[in-house]
Amino acid sequence: MDKELRQLRQLFSSDNVRVEKCGIGKVNAALGAQCMINEFHPDCIISSGCAGGNGDDINVQDVVVSSELCYHDVYCGTAIDNTTQFGQVQGLPVRFQADEIMLHHAQQMKNENGFQIHTGLIVTGDWFVDSKEKMRSIIAHFPDAKAVDMESCAIAQTCYLNHVPFISFRVISDIPLRDTDASQYHDFWNTVADHSFQVTKTFVERL
């Protein structure tokens, strides 16, 4: 991950952009976002990383931009009034919405500069999806999910509570339903990650 952090810091050399590493998983992601908010008071937060993809139209190296986000490993019961849904933290939205202005800019980038960009639901959990069975269990609850990761929704929740606009970019590293041993994921880091993160730089330059 240190290599990827150096790559991102090289991409974003402006004093107006701060690049930080959160680490893997929901707690690390939330703590990283909160520290950034407390120290730098950002106008917005953009999360960049990789994710497993879902859908016939999704391929490795494509980019999924969050239109909405939720957890795939949270269940707080149904509540007395049956309002709480699977994936929802009780008292918070069923799904966290990406910032509309940033989402609009991201949608304008579709098919530009060779980028294949999809917008949709990103689901998050502390679970590395390395088998078809794991992926099927997630998609059973969230068939409309475009990507599955371990950080995005935790950052979205932190930003929601702090009233900071948020969006997540996830480069598709593998398609779990087409991969049996996580080989796509490891090949991704060896071959195409350097090029793929250029999409986030292009997005920042549009803001």
What do these predicted regions represent?
Residues G55-F142:
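Mid-sequence, gly/pro-rich, charge-dense loop/helix-turn segments that line enzyme active sites
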Residues P176-L207:
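His/Asp/Glu-rich mid-to-C-terminal helical/loop segments that flank catalytic regions of hydrolases
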Residues F128-L177, D181:
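A C-terminal functional module that forms or caps the active site or interfaces directly
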Residues G32, I101-Q108, V192-F203:
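Short, well-ordered amphipathic alpha-helical segments that serve as non-catalytic structural scaffolds
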Residues D43-I46:
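Structural motif
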Residues M1-H41, I58:
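N-terminal short beta-loop-beta anion/metal-coordinating cradle
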Residues Q34-E39, D57, A156-P165:
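Alpha-helix C-terminal capping segments
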